[in-house]
């Protein structure tokens, strides 16, 4: 039987249940609570209180998301786009990417080693194939170019 979210307590409990599983951004949490039938005024009040109590934090969510996606092999371009689509502020996204402490060149090199066994492309077709894969994963074209020309990774 579905939970009815018609009281502040029910909305808060559901929000806390979602936050207990993983970090969420305010926009994402609002969307999930609306999908469950909570009225907007109860959602706003509950989320404001969670922010005041330090239980809901955009910066913690950004840090968690960037770290998770980087560990999954995705680069800064892709992560930035995913966060934009989730409705987060561009300045906050840029700050999170700057402060994450991730060496994107090293991550790119690790992904390339894992996928292509460290084999530099021998012809234009192979270079394009490797470049497409790495670009799709969200790495900047200048980094990819340096790596595939043999000048990246070990600078």
From Swiss-Prot:
Record has Transport as a keyword: no
InterPro entries from the UniProt entry: RecX_HTH_1st (IPR053926), RecX_HTH_2nd (IPR053924), RecX_HTH_3rd (IPR053925), Regulatory_RecX (IPR003783), WH-like_DNA-bd_sf (IPR036388)
Disulfide cysteine pairs (residue numbers): none
Cellular component, GO, one term: cytoplasm
UniProt record, GO biological process: regulation of DNA repair
Main location: cytoplasm
Cell compartment(s), UniProt: Cytoplasm
HAMAP family the UniProt entry points to: RecX
Keyword vocabulary terms for this entry: Cytoplasm
Name of the featured protein: Regulatory protein RecX
Gene: recX
Domain of life: Bacteria
Ranges annotated as spanning the membrane: none
Species whose genome carries this gene: Pseudomonas savastanoi pv. phaseolicola (strain 1448A / Race 6) (Pseudomonas syringae pv. phaseolicola (strain 1448A / Race 6))
Keyword Amino-acid biosynthesis: no
Entry's family note: Belongs to the RecX family.
Role noted for this protein: Modulates RecA activity.
């Amino acid at each position: 039987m579905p939970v009815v979210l018609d009281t502040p307590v029910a909305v808060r409990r559901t929000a806390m249940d979602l936050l207990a599983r993983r970090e969420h951004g305010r926009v994402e949490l609002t969307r999930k609570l609306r999908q469950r039938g909570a009225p907007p005024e109860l959602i706003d009040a509950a989320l404001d209180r969670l922010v005041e109590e330090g239980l809901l934090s955009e910066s913690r969510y950004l840090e968690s998301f960037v770290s998770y996606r980087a560990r999954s092999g995705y680069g800064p371009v892709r992560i930035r786009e995913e966060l934009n689509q989730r409705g987060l502020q561009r300045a906050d996204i840029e700050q999170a990417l700057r402060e994450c402490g991730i060496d994107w060149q090293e991550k790119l090199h690790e992904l390339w080693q894992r996928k292509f066994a460290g084999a530099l492309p021998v012809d234009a077709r192979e270079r394009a194939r490797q470049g497409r894969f790495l670009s799709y994963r969200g790495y900047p074209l200048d980094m990819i170019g340096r790596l595939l020309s043999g000048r990246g990774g070990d600078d």
